[in-house]
């Protein structure tokens, strides 16, 4: 038999067979595009969750830094009408104290959302672009007796 470059040859052992070079390249581009879309959705979800949960702390820090006389000396009406420097210092301290617990809460909720949406399952490994899976039919086990089948017990008894 002649050895043709790029021809599909069966791999001994029934494992995955390599794809043609052009097919491999096209699949690699598609796998990369899908993985980039999943990563972009992950970043968008992370920004949405962090932005929503960290909003109170960021607002306090923003007003504290914008209105305190040691930083920007802003003469905007919200800065001069409501608080003085001790109030803006309290805003800064409270904002920094709230930042870490809210960050932990935001990351925990992001993780829970990722697990619930199963976003990690959407990532495709590059081995799928390089190898084609063989579809071998799984043989069904033959029934030994025509009677009802008893499920194996695990040793636990529920009373």
From Swiss-Prot:
It comes from the Eukaryota. Its main location: membrane. Residues 135-159 are annotated as: Disordered. PANTHER family: TRANSMEMBRANE PROTEIN 88, TRANSMEMBRANE PROTEIN 88-RELATED. This is Transmembrane protein 88. It comes from Bos taurus (Bovine). Interacts (via C-terminus) with DVL1. One of its GO terms (cellular component) is plasma membrane. Inhibits the Wnt/beta-catenin signaling pathway. Crucial for heart development and acts downstream of GATA factors in the pre-cardiac mesoderm to specify lineage commitment of cardiomyocyte development. GO terms for biological process: negative regulation of canonical Wnt signaling pathway; Wnt signaling pathway. The chain crosses the membrane at residues 43-63, 88-108. It is found in: Cell membrane. Belongs to the TMEM88 family. Keywords: Cell membrane, Developmental protein, Membrane, Transmembrane, Transmembrane helix, Wnt signaling pathway. It is a multi-pass membrane protein.
């Amino acid at each position: 038999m002649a050895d043709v470059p790029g021809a599909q040859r069966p791999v001994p052992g029934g494992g995955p067979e390599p794809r043609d070079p052009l097919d491999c390249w096209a699949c690699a581009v598609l796998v990369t595009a899908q993985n980039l879309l999943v990563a972009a959705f992950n970043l968008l979800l992370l920004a949405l969750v962090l932005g929503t949960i960290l909003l109170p702390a960021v607002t306090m820090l923003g007003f504290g830094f914008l209105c305190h006389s040691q930083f920007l000396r802003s003469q905007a009406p919200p800065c001069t009408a409501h608080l003085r420097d001790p109030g803006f210092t309290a805003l800064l301290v409270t904002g920094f104290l709230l930042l870490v617990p809210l960050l932990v809460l935001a990351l925990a909720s992001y993780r829970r959302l990722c697990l619930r949406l199963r976003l990690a399952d959407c990532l495709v490994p590059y081995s799928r672009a390089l190898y084609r899976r063989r579809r071998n039919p799984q043989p069904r086990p033959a029934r030994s007796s025509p009677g009802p089948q008893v499920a194996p017990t695990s040793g636990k008894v529920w009373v």
